[in-house]
Amino acid sequence: MRIARFATPDGVSFGIVEGDPDSPATCTLRQVDELPWDGQPVFTGKSFALSEVRLLAPIFPTKIVAVGKNYIDHAKELGSQTSDEPVIFIKPPTTIIGPGVPIRRPAASQRVDHEGELAIIINQPCRNVDAMDARRVILGYTIANDVTARDIQRAEGQWTRAKSYDTFCPLGPWIETQLDPSDQDILVEVTHSDGSSEVRQDENTAAVVHTVSEIIEFISSVMTLL
């Protein structure tokens, strides 16, 4: 199931994506009365063509807990080693934007980088979740761009300022509830003003240091996830 959050002239709604998203005119969004946290959508009876709506960030969480250096190759790019335990940091909700919204480069930075990530959406408040039980608290997954002011990150050593500027966390386009997080390609392709494009990031979640279940167990031992 694909869960989207979208805007129409009548307001903001959640909906279930049905059909081929590569054909926006025929792909539809069946409106639901609220985000189906339990995986059981309640339909309102209204439907919209994907081409008729504006997709928004699929969720607006209370906090974004991110994991750094979880890919061996990326850790090498930063000139550091991977860790026996997840390296976590928090991005504020004010970083979140939806698909197609411009990322604003802060005046303090001359180098802003993309970091394509698999984002885990938690379906309930939870604490001290065992890794073997982690699937129970996952609603689904979406795509995140952990935008980073790389020059600031390298100059300061700590990551909070470099990763917390407004617009520094694009999310979407929707939540995928039936997805295997252990084998997903993370591909970032940049399109230039002249129409040309190039692949800037090509990774697979099979290469992570810490799995989704291990990450949930670790973070929920520190703070409540909700």
Regions found by a protein language model. Name each.
Residues 4, 54-56, 77-79, 103-112, ...:
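A generic local secondary-structure boundary/capping motif
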Residues 10, 48-51, 74, 150-226:
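Catalytic-pocket segment enriched in acidic/His residues
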Residues 1-86, 179, 187, 196-198:
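N-terminal non-catalytic cap/leader segment that marks the start of a structured domain
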Residues 82-99, 114:
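Structural signature of FAD isoalloxazine-binding scaffolds in flavoprotein oxidoreductases
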Residues 116-118:
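Ligand-binding beta-strand-loop-alpha-helix segment within the catalytic cores
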Residues 58, 111, 224-226:
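Residue-level "contact hotspot" at macromolecular interaction interfaces
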